[in-house]
C-alpha cells in the first residue's frame, strides 16, 4: 500500500535545534539561586522635600565608623560578637505585644527587679539557639545587601499603605521594653505586598547605635546607617500572632534607614520628645496618634525584598522583609536623643541594639529597580528574579509551543500534498465504439 505522506509526528522523532536549546536550559534550572518562593543604595545625595535621601556610597557611614564585621561563608555560623563592643537587638516576641508569647521569650525585663525567668542577652548570640533552636536556622535576619548581587524583579510593585494617617485620638502606647522603644499600633493600618498578600500593622520600633557607632540592623555593601525603623505586620490569613510565627509570609516587616541631616524631622519629633518619660526599662505612656506613613520614606516604589526571620529569639523564619532604598533624615540632635535617652537591663544605657548580619545561604535579595546596574560604573549582569519553578514553567511552555507549531506545519504540508495529488488526476470517460453484428 502506498504511503500517504510523511508522518505528522516526524517533528517529535527528531529534536529541532530550538528544542535542543530549551532542553539545555532545563538542565540549567538547578543552578539558579533560591528566591522567595523557593524558601518556604546606591542612590545619590539629593534634595528631598520630605527630608529623605536615597542610599548611596557618598552618604553611607565611613568604614571606620562602622563596627568591623563580615558575613561568614555560606554554611558557617556567624562570628561571635564581643559584648563589650556592642549589644544586639531586633524583632523578638517581646517586641510583638501578644499574650500568646512564651514566658521565656519576653526579654530581660525585671532581671534585677525581682524577675526570674530565663532570657536571651545581646552579648551572647551564640547561646540563642539554646533559647530557641530557630536562631540557628539557615535563613536568618538581618543581612548585608550587596547591590551588585540583587535581582531586579519587575513584578515588585509600589507599596500601598491604608489607614496609616492616624488622628491624635485615640492615643497610642509608647513603651521602653528594655530592648527598644516600641509604639503599639491600633487596628486598621493595612498594606498589601501583592495579590492575596494583605497585612495589618502591629507595632513599630527602632534600632540605633551611639554617637561613635551607627546602629542599623541591615547594611548596604557592608555600610551601616545611624539607625533603622521597623514596622511589623501580621498576615490577615492569621488571626493570632502565634499562628503566624514560622509560617512562610506570616509576618512582614517594613524597614527604612535613618540618616543624619541638618534639619529636624517633625514626624519623628512626635516620638523622640517623649523618650525621657519612658527612660526606665518597663515604663510606658500614652501619646497622641500620629501619621505613621510620615515615619517612612516618601518613595515606596524602590525597595529590596527577601525572606528572613525575626532577629531576636525566637528567631522565627518565614518573615518577608521590605527594606526601602530611600533613607529618612533626622537631625544630629534627634539621633543623639535616640541613643542616650533610654535605659535597659542592669541599669545600662540602651544603645547598639542590633544583631550582626547573617549569611544569605543561597537566598536572593530582589529589588524593585535595577539596583545592581546602578551600583557599578561598569556594565553588570542584572540577575533575574525568576525562581526555579518560574523557569521550569517557561521552559515547558516554550517546548509545548514549539512542538505544537511544528505539528501544525506538518499537517499543513500533508494537506497540501494530498490536494496536489488530486489535482494531477484527470478523469476521461470511456469511448464507446460500435461493432457490427
From Swiss-Prot:
TM stretches of this protein: 391-411
Topology Cytoplasmic: residue spans: 412-437
Extent of the signal sequence: 1-31
Residues bearing glycans: 98, 325
Cofactor field: Zn(2+)
Modified residues (Phosphotyrosine): 427
Name used for this protein in its record: Carbonic anhydrase 9
Organism whose genome encodes this protein: Mus musculus
Amino acid at each position: 500500500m502506498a504511503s500517504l505522506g510523511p508522518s505528522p509526528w516526524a517533528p517529535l522523532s527528531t529534536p529541532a535545534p530550538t528544542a535542543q536549546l530549551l532542553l539545555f536550559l532545563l538542565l540549567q534550572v538547578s543552578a539558579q539561586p533560591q528566591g522567595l518562593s523557593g524558601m518556604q543604595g546606591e542612590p545619590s545625595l539629593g534634595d528631598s522635600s520630605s527630608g529623605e535621601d536615597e542610599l548611596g556610597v557618598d552618604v553611607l557611614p565611613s568604614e571606620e565608623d562602622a563596627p568591623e564585621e563580615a558575613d561568614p561563608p555560606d554554611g558557617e555560623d556567624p562570628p561571635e560578637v564581643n559584648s563589650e563592643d556592642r549589644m544586639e537587638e531586633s524583632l523578638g516576641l517581646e517586641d510583638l505585644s501578644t499574650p500568646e508569647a512564651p514566658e521565656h521569650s519576653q526579654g530581660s525585663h525585671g532581671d534585677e527587679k525581682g524577675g526570674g525567668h530565663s532570657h536571651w542577652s545581646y552579648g551572647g548570640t551564640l547561646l540563642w539557639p539554646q533559647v530557641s533552636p530557630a536562631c540557628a536556622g539557615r535563613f536568618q535576619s538581618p543581612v548585608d545587601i550587596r547591590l551588585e548581587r540583587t535581582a531586579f524583579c519587575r513584578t515588585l510593585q509600589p507599596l500601598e499603605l491604608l489607614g496609616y494617617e492616624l488622628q491624635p485620638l485615640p492615643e497610642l502606647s509608647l513603651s521602653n521594653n528594655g530592648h527598644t522603644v516600641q509604639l503599639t499600633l491600633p487596628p486598621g493600618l493595612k498594606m498589601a505586598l501583592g495579590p492575596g498578600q494583605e497585612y495589618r500593622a502591629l507595632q513599630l520600633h527602632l534600632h540605633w547605635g551611639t554617637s561613635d557607632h551607627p546602629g542599623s540592623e541591615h547594611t548596604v555593601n557592608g555600610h551601616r546607617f545611624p539607625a533603622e525603623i521597623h514596622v511589623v505586620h501580621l498576615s490577615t490569613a492569621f488571626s493570632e500572632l502565634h499562628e503566624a510565627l514560622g509560617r512562610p509570609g506570616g509576618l512582614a516587616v517594613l524597614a527604612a534607614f535613618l540618616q543624619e541631616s541638618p534639619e529636624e524631622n517633625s514626624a519623628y519629633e512626635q516620638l523622640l520628645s517623649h523618650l525621657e518619660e519612658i527612660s526606665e526599662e518597663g515604663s510606658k505612656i500614652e501619646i497622641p496618634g500620629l501619621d505613621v506613613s510620615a515615619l517612612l520614606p516618601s518613595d515606596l516604589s524602590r525597595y529590596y525584598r527577601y525572606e528572613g526571620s525575626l532577629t531576636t529569639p525566637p528567631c522565627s523564619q518565614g518573615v518577608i522583609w521590605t527594606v526601602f532604598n530611600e533613607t529618612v533624615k533626622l537631625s544630629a540632635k534627634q539621633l543623639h536623643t535616640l541613643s542616650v535617652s533610654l535605659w535597659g537591663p542592669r541599669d545600662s544605657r540602651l544603645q547598639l541594639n542590633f544583631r550582626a548580619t547573617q549569611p544569605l545561604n543561597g537566598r536572593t535579595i530582589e529589588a524593585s529597580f535595577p539596583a545592581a546596574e546602578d551600583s557599578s560604573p561598569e556594565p553588570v549582569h542584572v540577575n533575574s528574579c525568576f525562581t526555579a519553578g518560574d523557569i521550569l514553567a517557561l521552559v515547558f511552555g516554550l517546548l509545548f509551543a514549539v512542538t505544537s507549531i511544528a505539528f501544525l506545519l506538518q499537517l499543513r504540508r500533508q494537506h497540501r500534498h494530498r490536494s496536489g495529488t488530486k489535482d494531477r488526476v484527470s478523469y476521461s470517460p470511456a469511448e464507446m465504439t460500435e461493432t457490427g453484428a
